């Protein structure tokens, strides 16, 4: 069978699966597809509603979402996810990817650096001063929205726009700042895929998210494109480090907390970076490295792409199934679909839709605007969960501002919604903690195992990697946290920390008697401004590395 025919058949199979999923959704949630002008047949629905109350429905949701969160279940899930990590460490081209950042900051680095943070909607430029002893200061900064007009800039025009913003920010510092004979060191936090070729270089590939700047620049060196645009404005800058957001978070927190070995991004999406022994990683994962890189790189920061793990391990409910089956990329990011800001609101919306059909929520009338997928934002979920007022008046006001209700939601409706939001976010915190615990165990296994007994496929005839960690290390660590959900969702970080405490206690107790005061731990620590600060720290570390090399 020819390759094109196989592709056609595969696409037809995907199309058929999506049609089946849509039909299932029509059967389960007919209100999503009902003509709003059609008169409701109250007799039928009246009998249907009497099958269960809102309280009974909430109990079912609670059972389905929280029953996997027993300590025993979470330990088992953690062990299974660890096996997925181990497999991907050896050969996967899409996850557990080693970066070029092998050294962590000591906290003593000093200097003033230009830092850039290019995200999906904002471009930030800042001048950062590192003062040593973990002291970081933003001397000057600017933030520019990346609107649709900017996204449509093709080729070098986008980098020219960046250079204009860089020049504007530096001019606010001093007329000649950035124009001296000695190049100004610059770090870049780049939130898009690149084919990285060194700590300071990478080749442009398709960016997605509506950006067109890769048109005409594919395969060109990213740092050179930025530098050339800056030179056209007589700016003398040099790109010394390129990092992604999770690596930037780890580096920024490690500068002030020497126990930082992991980072967590949890906002619209999620990811984890971890400082990991080189010897435990498959050699093919490294691609082409500079000469001698393996001689001095004992560790490397891994981009785990955590969102892709947990498939077939983390239990799903019928609402998760509908979300997954109707997604453009079903099964692609199992963990992400159940824990992130992009999807928590949609899970709640799907539960609401069924509650309207079967438990008389909102008197059986689903607001028309809630019929659209992803129309129930996670910010509403967070607000509802945080509302402790007796009659939930603030929640009612927000709901009626965002959606049009034929009849105002009752207090019973609002209490049901708050409970559902609490249940959905509780599971998200538990599943995330399970994945983090799994990564912690994986790191401990690799870090404290006998390197002579390593079974990793890193050691090849063509390249021998026998790096042995000589520095004293600890199983206790801090995780740098950034992102709207982990930083701002009420109680989420505390709940996740509580699960981590239980999981680490269980792991510690299984290894024999330990002094509670010295037992290994995981601490979730906020890393504010991590993308921009981490870019500066990455430069400082790279500069120190060049000096020592």
UniProtKB/Swiss-Prot annotation:
InterPro entries: ATPase_NBD, Hexokinase, Hexokinase_C, Hexokinase_N. ATP binds at residue 110. Pfam families: Hexokinase_1 (PF00349), Hexokinase_2 (PF03727). Residues 106-243 are annotated as: Hexokinase small subdomain. GO terms for biological process: glucose 6-phosphate metabolic process; glucose metabolic process; glycolytic process; intracellular glucose homeostasis; mannose metabolic process. Monomer. Catalyzes the phosphorylation of hexose, such as D-glucose and D-fructose, to hexose 6-phosphate (D-glucose 6-phosphate and D-fructose 6-phosphate, respectively). Mediates the initial step of glycolysis by catalyzing phosphorylation of D-glucose to D-glucose 6-phosphate. This is Hexokinase-1. It comes from Aspergillus fumigatus (strain ATCC MYA-4609 / CBS 101355 / FGSC A1100 / Af293).
